[in-house]
């Protein structure tokens, strides 16, 4: 299982959890972003800087992620694309996206986009919390354990 991270919007605390998990579980970890990223020295961890542009990092992840890989992203369209390739998807808040749940998330995203286009303030996501951090760490551990048993 290769771990791919949509790193532009991924919180630093989540990246730190992923760095430790890559070492602990001996899994390759690739962070993809349109900016320079710092990573700890490890043969398992690398950062890919893609050119700036709309969905360039997403396109890189879609192109390279494969069946059984894990993709970390809060980007619903990206999640839908990699799910089609049989990858696993986990949000930085610890929500596991599946083929069943992604349709609902895409519909909700589209509805919120329509409201914003109509000038309605829909607010933003809640601030990232300790509970989100714990939820992510726990969900990641469950996925890593399941992968190790397979």
UniProtKB/Swiss-Prot annotation:
InterPro entries xrefs: UPF0178
A Pfam family recorded for this sequence: DUF188
CDD domains named among the record's database cross-references: PIN_YqxD-like
Coiled coil start-end: none
Protein family per UniProt: Belongs to the UPF0178 family.
NCBIfam families: PRK00124.1
Protein name stated in the entry: UPF0178 protein Bpet3884
Organism: Bordetella petrii (strain ATCC BAA-461 / DSM 12804 / CCUG 43448)
């Amino acid at each position: 299982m290769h771990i791919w991270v949509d790193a532009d919007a991924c919180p630093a605390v989540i990246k730190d959890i992923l760095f430790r998990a890559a070492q602990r579980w001996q899994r390759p970890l690739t962070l993809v972003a349109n900016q320079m990223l710092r990573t700890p020295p490890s043969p398992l961890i690398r950062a890919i800087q893609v050119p700036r542009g709309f969905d360039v990092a997403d396109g890189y992840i879609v192109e390279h992620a494969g069946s059984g890989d894990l993709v970390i992203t809060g980007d619903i369209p990206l999640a839908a694309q990699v799910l089609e390739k049989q990858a696993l998807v986990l949000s930085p808040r610890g929500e596991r996206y599946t083929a069943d749940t992604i349709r609902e998330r895409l519909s909700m995203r589209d509805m919120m986009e329509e409201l914003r286009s109509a000038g309605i303030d829909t607010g933003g996501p809640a601030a990232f919390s300790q509970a989100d951090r714990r939820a992510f760490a726990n969900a990641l551990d469950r996925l890593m354990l399941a992968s190790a048993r397979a």
